[in-house]
């Protein structure tokens, strides 16, 4: 909701006193709107954008993440380094080694590594690229993946800056490690 409002429509979302988003937003315009046409037009636009997002969400979350891994073979990662599928295979290998050191399930780490980039081929992330990684975690949760795996997928890009939160769970740490140790690729 917030990304759609702020990044795409340049609206200001509003929040209640508990910090929850409300069903209202603010728009700045240089014209008076005595008849409410500007308000109505903006409401229609945001409703259409959110309807698209909802459609993509329901479609994408129903598609098996493991079965979509092969689609990464068609996405180039970086010249000379192969596809995202190739990257995921390297991440699985490194994650497996880290799992031994962290004394955590190798299977869970390898599973999270295997599917962590699959949201890149989802329609929702295609429409809202800034949700990559985040949506992968939500898709995994919606499909019944264990919480550790979903969280590792969601937190794979953390930290995103010096003020950003950092992962604290072992599976997320392994996820961050295999993402950031190979970031120089």
Regions found by a protein language model. Name each.
Residues 1-60:
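His/Asp/Glu-rich acidic catalytic environments and adjacent acidic regulatory segments
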Residues 27-30, 66-87, 117-124, 135-140, ...:
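Active-site flanking loop/helix segments enriched in acidic
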Residues 26, 46, 72, 95, ...:
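Short alpha-helical scaffolding segments that buttress acidic/His motifs in well-ordered protein cores
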Residues 92-98, 132-141:
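An active-site-proximal "capping" alpha-helix that borders the catalytic cofactor pocket
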Residues 10, 113, 141, 146-177:
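Histidine/acidic-rich helix-loop-helix segments that form or flank divalent-metal centers
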Residues 56-66, 83-88, 128, 151-154, ...:
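Short coil/turn segments at secondary-structure boundaries
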Residues 17, 34, 77-84, 102, ...:
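Charge-biased, low-complexity intrinsically disordered regions
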């Amino acid at each position: 909701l917030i990304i759609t409002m702020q990044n795409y429509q340049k609206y200001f979302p509003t929040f209640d006193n508990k910090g929850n988003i409300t069903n209202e937003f603010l728009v700045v315009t240089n014209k008076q709107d005595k008849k409410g046409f500007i308000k109505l037009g903006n409401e229609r636009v945001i409703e259409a954008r959110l309807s698209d997002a909802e459609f993509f969400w329901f479609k994408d979350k129903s598609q098996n993440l493991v079965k979509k891994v092969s689609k990464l073979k068609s996405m180039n990662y970086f010249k000379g380094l192969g596809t995202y599928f190739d990257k995921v295979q390297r991440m699985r290998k490194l994650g497996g080694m880290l799992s031994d050191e962290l004394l955590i399930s190798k299977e869970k780490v390898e599973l999270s590594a295997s599917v962590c980039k699959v949201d890149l081929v989802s329609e929702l992330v295609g429409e809202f690229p800034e949700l990559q990684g985040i949506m992968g975690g939500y898709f995994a949760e919606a499909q019944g993946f264990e919480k550790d795996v979903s969280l590792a997928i969601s937190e794979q890009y953390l930290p995103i800056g010096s003020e950003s939160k950092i992962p604290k769970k072992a599976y997320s740490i392994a996820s961050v490690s295999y993402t950031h140790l190979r970031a120089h690729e």
